[in-house]
């Protein structure tokens, strides 16, 4: 029970911090944190809640397939399947899914992936080589959630990572809440920088094709 309360507090603090950045507009987004490994359980944001508010109903505990562990009237997000795929296939401890203007714009500039390079902040992703290049996959935003989940699952490669969904934000996961938040901050910085650079240069650079 102590672990549940500890993880609840941790997730609540993350929600508060991301809310101050306006990364949960119009009740969008969802975040989760692992509570136990065997059996797998995790806390996830309840569907349709105003994340600028802090209430006892912010999160609910679900199992390895996203079904509530305790009797509740709360519903987990429809995208809980993305979280279950991550937790069932990795040792990740936290998953963050947010909608920002920048990450949505990026998915309209590129088709299957966005490539970013030569930025010091890439080291926050535990990539240390000089002039490092990263590739972030972009998948289509299917209304059929099982199809979205299956396409998402193909890009889960390790205990940390990120996938962009076209016009539907980014999902980032990490070894724990600190790692996941750090990675999310790094990706959002990179997106913001890239978009500003393109606006100065006058268009999509480096031979990439606009997807819009």
UniProtKB/Swiss-Prot annotation:
One Gene Ontology cellular component term attached to this UniProt record is: cytoplasm
> What are its GO biological-process terms?
L-methionine salvage from methylthioadenosine
Q: Does the keyword Cytoplasm apply?
A: no
Gene3D superfamilies given in the database record: Class II aldolase/adducin N-terminal domain
Q: What class of enzyme is it?
A: lyase
Recorded family membership: Belongs to the aldolase class II family. MtnB subfamily.
Q: State the name under which the record lists this protein.
A: Methylthioribulose-1-phosphate dehydratase
